């Protein structure tokens, strides 16, 4: 049998000036997705994707590293102005926002917290006793 040739999909360089940085900061991980204004993903990264494992994924340093990785990928596509949507109660949320603001060549135009708040919905998890 002949071996099949594996071809990789070529990365198409888009030229997008404006975008949205979605930061999902959970208690266990921080996920960052950079999209265009229509919501199509341009670049993404997470603390676990960068090699942080276990409890190290939830640290502020891991969140900062995830933001820098996603923004560097997005800047290859020409991102210059971004808005930030942040969701979740994680420990890396403030550090992630600061990391986006400190990137050279990127201007933050707006910031919005889109964390869903329950109006007496599901019962929350019980308090930890250590």
UniProtKB/Swiss-Prot annotation:
> Which GO biological-process labels does this protein carry?
translation
Please give an example of a GO cellular component term from this record: ribosome
Gene3D superfamilies assigned to the protein according to its UniProt record, in alphabetical order: Ribosomal protein S11
Q: Which UniProt keywords apply?
A: Ribonucleoprotein, Ribosomal protein, RNA-binding, rRNA-binding
Is the rRNA-binding keyword given for this protein? yes
Membrane-spanning residues: none
> What molecular function does GO assign, one term?
structural constituent of ribosome
**Its biological function?**
Located on the platform of the 30S subunit, it bridges several disparate RNA helices of the 16S rRNA. Forms part of the Shine-Dalgarno cleft in the 70S ribosome.
Q: Which NCBIfam families match?
A: PRK05309.1 (NF003698), uS11_bact (TIGR03632)
> Which family does the UniProt entry place this protein in?
Belongs to the universal ribosomal protein uS11 family.
Oligomer and partners: Part of the 30S ribosomal subunit. Interacts with proteins S7 and S18. Binds to IF-3.
Know the name of this protein?
A: Small ribosomal subunit protein uS11
């Amino acid at each position: 049998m002949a071996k099949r040739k594996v071809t990789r999909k070529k990365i198409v360089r888009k030229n997008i000036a404006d975008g949205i940085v979605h930061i999902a900061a959970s208690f266990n991980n921080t996920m960052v997705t950079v999209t265009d204004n229509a919501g199509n993903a341009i670049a993404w990264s997470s603390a676990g994707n960068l090699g942080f494992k276990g409890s190290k994924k939830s640290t502020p340093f891991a969140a900062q590293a995830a933001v820098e990785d996603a923004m560097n990928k997005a800047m290859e596509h020409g991102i210059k102005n971004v808005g930030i949507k942040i969701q979740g109660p994680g420990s890396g949320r403030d550090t992630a926002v600061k990391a986006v603001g400190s990137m050279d060549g990127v201007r933050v135009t707006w910031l919005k917290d889109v964390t869903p708040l329950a109006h007496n919905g599901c019962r929350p998890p019980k308090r930890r006793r250590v």
